[in-house]
């Protein structure tokens, strides 16, 4: 699922805090915005098995 909320791509350089918007450009500095959604799940993740095993051990 893709998020409609976008963030200013250069907010660290131009703003004190993140600027969120629905537009394709930042309303404050007119720079390009990017999607705020996390990276998609990758089933070929080489370390996924180890991460899941560690998470399960922590739960027990």
UniProtKB/Swiss-Prot annotation:
Gene Ontology MF annotations: snoRNA binding
Domain of life: Archaea
GO cellular component, one term: ribonucleoprotein complex
Keywords: Ribonucleoprotein, Ribosome biogenesis, rRNA processing
Keyword presence, rRNA processing: yes
Presence of keyword Methyltransferase: no
GO BP, sorted A to Z: pseudouridine synthesis; rRNA processing
InterPro entries documented for this protein: H/ACA_rnp_Nop10, H/ACA_rnp_Nop10_sf, Nop10_arc-typ
Similarity annotation: Belongs to the NOP10 family.
Role, per record: Involved in ribosome biogenesis; more specifically in 18S rRNA pseudouridylation and in cleavage of pre-rRNA.
Protein name as annotated: Ribosome biogenesis protein Nop10
Originating organism: Haloquadratum walsbyi (strain DSM 16790 / HBSQ001)
């Amino acid at each position: 699922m893709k998020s409609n909320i976008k963030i200013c791509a250069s907010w660290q350089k131009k703003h004190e805090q993140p600027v969120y918007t629905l537009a394709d450009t930042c309303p404050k500095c007119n720079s390009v915005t990017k999607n705020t959604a996390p990276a998609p799940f990758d089933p070929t993740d080489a370390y996924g098995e180890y991460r899941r095993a560690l998470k399960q051990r922590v739960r027990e």
